[in-house]
């Protein structure tokens, strides 16, 4: 009988202390990337600087094609990040014949800085196809630097 009287106060104290603890949430919060409009423009700026640095030393450099190439490159960069910007629309609505791309993924889980960096690195290899090994290396180096 005495054991009963000692057990109940101890059980009440333990239950009170246990109820004060915050429960652990077994579901971790998912990564939510910031909108592309909240990301710095340093990525675009540095890739543009690299393009102009490489382009001016290439054989057959002419200013007019360089301007056109930069326009195409940046138009593609815009289309890369436009699914993550709610207030902006694709150029397909303004340019006749421009392909419409339906994005079906979750835009909150995409790191837009990485997507834009990958776009520029891949695109530069196509536009600067006659760059020498050192210039190709500088493209790869900038891509790696942007990921840090």
Describe the residue ranges of each PLM region:
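C-terminal motif of bacterial Sec signal peptides marking the signal peptidase cleavage site
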Residues: 16-19
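Hydrophobic helical h-region of N-terminal Sec-dependent signal peptides
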Residues: 10-14
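Bacterial N-terminal signal peptides that target proteins for export
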Residues: 1-9
């Amino acid at each position: 009988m005495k054991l009963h009287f000692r057990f109940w106060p101890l059980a009440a104290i333990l239950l009170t202390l246990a109820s004060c603890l915050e429960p652990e949430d077994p579901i971790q919060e998912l990564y939510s990337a910031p909108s592309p409009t909240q990301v710095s423009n340093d990525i675009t700026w540095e890739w543009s600087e690299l393009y102009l640095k490489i382009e001016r030393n290439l054989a057959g450099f002419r200013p007019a094609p360089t301007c056109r190439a930069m326009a195409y490159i940046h138009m593609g960069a815009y289309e890369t990040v436009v699914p993550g910007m709610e207030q902006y629309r694709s150029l397909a609505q303004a340019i006749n014949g421009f392909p419409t791309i339906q994005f079906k993924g979750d835009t909150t889980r995409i790191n837009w800085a990485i997507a834009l960096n990958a776009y520029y690195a891949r695109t530069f290899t196509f536009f600067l196809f006659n760059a020498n090994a050192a210039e190709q290396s500088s493209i790869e180096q900038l891509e790696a630097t942007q990921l840090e």
